[in-house]
Structures are given as structure tokens and as C-alpha cells.
Amino acid sequence: MGAGARFALVGHSERRHVFGETDAEVELKVSAANAEGLTAVVCVGETLEERRAGRVKEVIVRQLNAALSGFSQEGGKSLLVAYEPVWAIGTGETATADDVVAAHGILRSRLQESVGDTFAADVAILYGGSVNPANAADLLALPNVGGVLVGGASLEPESFAKIAEAGSP
């Protein structure tokens, strides 16, 4: 890309909520990112209502399936997935460790079914839901959490630096 971009954030909860972005539009954006040689960072996550209704798996699998429909592995394309429980974004609430492990496990399994074990093993699944310096290290230590998608805490340089340090070996 002429501007030096390497990643495209696709399907973020704010785009879905504020602009009514649909799964079909996410699919098209993943395809467009692929065509331009960008790594799509596909965001999936449930609302509080969907969570309370016991629909977490249904929602995140549906969203991931739509995104994967626009994805091609040809030419060494890459992909990242970010689980962002909508109810935890900007609220100061973070999903429990059990919630994160369960959701990331669902996403990992779906990736393996869809793109195969080898490719799926290379797809990092990020967590993005009120990540802050106090919880980053614990989140990063969980199974299938390959990184964090930082929102509000990235606006404070000191907070962001502490989160980055939590992810350093």
C-alpha cells in the first residue's frame, strides 16, 4: 500500500453498532483487504443481550463464518481474529478468564474446521474488551490468546506502554 498500511481492522463493534455494518459488508471488506495485500483483523463479539440469551457461540461463529467467506489463503495471505465482547468495551468490565478461554476456544475450533489446522495455528486470536495495564498480563497468559486489541487505554501513552510491556517476553 502506498501509505504503508499492513493491517485493516474489519467488523469492529462500533462500526457494526454506529454504522449498522453487516456481516455481508464485513465479508466484502475482508475480501478487499486480501486483494490489497493487507492483513484483515476481523472483530467478532456478542452484545449483552446476546450473552444473556446464551447465544455467544452462535453469534461469534456466524460473524467469523461471514468474514472467512471473504478470505483467501492464496498467495500467503494472513488473518487475525479479535474477540471483542461488546458488553465489555468501554465499560471497565472485562470478560472472566473462563469467558475468554471459552470464546477463544470456539474461534480456534471454527478456524481449524474452516481453514485447516496448519493455517489456523498461525492465526492469532486477540482479546479486545476493556484491556488495561491491570489485566493485560493475565489476559495474555490465557490459552488461545495471541495478543490484545487495545481501545481506550491506547489513548494514554503510559497505560499503553504498560500493556505493551505485559506482552513482552
Regions found by a protein language model. Name each.
Residues M1-P169:
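Active-site loop-to-helix "anion-binding N-cap" substructures in soluble metabolic enzymes
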